[in-house]
A protein has these predicted regions:
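Alpha/beta enzyme core
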Residues: 1-83, 89-105, 151-178
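The DNA-recognition helices of helix-turn-helix-type DNA-binding domains
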Residues: 41, 114, 148
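Small/polar loops that bind or transfer phosphate-bearing groups
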Residues: 85-86, 114
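Gly/Ser/Thr-rich beta-alpha loop segments that engage phosphate groups in nucleotides
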Residues: 88-89, 110
Length: 178
């Protein structure tokens, strides 16, 4: 990339065995930023018509947690600019991405649904949240909940999944068994 004169950002997929290792290799070749995560065009199958249907499924806030996890991990191991794409629909979603380490968010589905004026709502929602928490800038909040700085970093790890399942198992004993 020595001949490239503009900053290059790579939009990643979540399908890497070791996302931090892959991002490190990108950093070594001169990439300046990464965005988590690219969404794929995913046609579906219509069982009645027996045909493949084109669909465009907008993102929802349910898409955000996967990206937050990646940001929380990458922001501890990379100096690259980190972007978040997918699942950002409110100022609070922007704040979540920043807390996990994002420098930028990309918004499409929310704008398709609400129009360009929605950008002002995202901005005002973020500013309101920052002010309410005592942050003067988004830079002050960036990475506060990443893997190294979160009050309980294990919440980002697989061990938390195991603890969650154990809690579910404990609750399942409340049920009457036949």
């Amino acid at each position: 990339m020595s001949g490239v004169q503009i900053p290059v950002t790579v939009k990643l997929t979540p399908f890497h065995a070791s996302l931090p290792a892959f991002v490190h290799r990108l950093e070594q070749v001169g990439v300046r930023g990464v965005t988590v995560f690219n969404r794929f065009y995913e046609p579906t199958v219509d069982l009645d018509a027996l045909e493949v249907r084109r669909t465009l499924t907008p993102s929802t806030a349910a898409d955000l947690p996967l990206r937050l996890h990646a940001l929380a991990v990458l922001s501890t191991s990379s100096e690259l600019s980190l972007g978040c794409s997918g699942g950002v629909h409110s100022g609070e979603d922007v704040a979540r991405a920043i807390l996990c380490g994002a420098h930028v968010v990309q918004v499409a589905s929310a704008l398709m649904e609400h129009g360009p004026a929605h950008l002002a709502k995202l901005r005002s929602g973020l500013l309101h949240w920052l002010d309410g928490k005592g942050y003067a800038t988004s830079a002050e909040a960036r990475g506060v909940l990443n893997l190294e700085r979160a009050p309980d970093p294990t919440a980002w790890t697989r061990m938390n999944y195991i603890r969650t399942l154990e809690g579910w198992r404990d609750r399942s004993s409340w049920r009457t068994r036949p």
